[in-house]
From Swiss-Prot:
It comes from Xenopus laevis (African clawed frog). Keywords: Developmental protein, Disulfide bond, Extracellular matrix, Glycoprotein, Lipoprotein, Secreted, Wnt signaling pathway. Disulfide bonds join C3-C17, C5-C12, C81-C112, C97-C107, C134-C135. It is found in: Secreted, Extracellular space, Extracellular matrix; Secreted. A lipid is attached at S9 (O-palmitoleoyl serine). This is Protein Wnt-7b.
């Protein structure tokens, strides 16, 4: 929820509030965590016509069954490291990576164990620095 105050000279004589959605980055972070913790399930067909089809945990990593808010999957994700025209994945080979980053832009993760070549770049830019004589 966000609020805004209205009034003379910044006073808050009237306050207007409204509901807002979470930031896109926050939603993405939660979805990525759910993706990382997703549970593999398999479809179990009923033997009788009156029984419904349901999902069963494929590999038991704990004795707890997934909650309604957990992410489950039936098929494994494609290998994003390799090019795959059927899924539209262009792979990660030849992309620039950050050698010191532990995140998805880091070479250890992006290069998928293939190794990588390092290049040193020098960037020159206007810094708008000012010199102040102090003493």
């Amino acid at each position: 929820q966000e609020c805004k105050c209205h009034g003379v000279s910044g006073s808050c004589t009237t306050k207007t509030c409204w509901n807002t959605l979470p930031k896109f980055r926050e939603i993405g972070f939660v979805l990525k965590e759910k993706y990382n913790d997703a549970v593999h399930v398999e479809v179990v067909r009923a033997n009788r016509l009156r029984q419904p089809t349901f999902l069963k945990i494929k590999k038991v990593r704990s004795y707890q069954k997934p909650m309604e808010t957990d992410l489950v999957y039936i098929e494994r994700s494609p290998n994003y490291c390799e090019e795959d025209s059927t899924t539209g994945s262009v792979g990660t080979q030849g992309r620039l990576c950050n050698r010191t980053s532990p995140h998805t832009d880091g070479c250890d993760l992006m290069c998928c164990g293939r190794g990588y070549n390092t290049h040193q770049y020098t960037k020159v830019w206007q810094c708008n620095c000012k010199f102040h004589w102090c003493c």
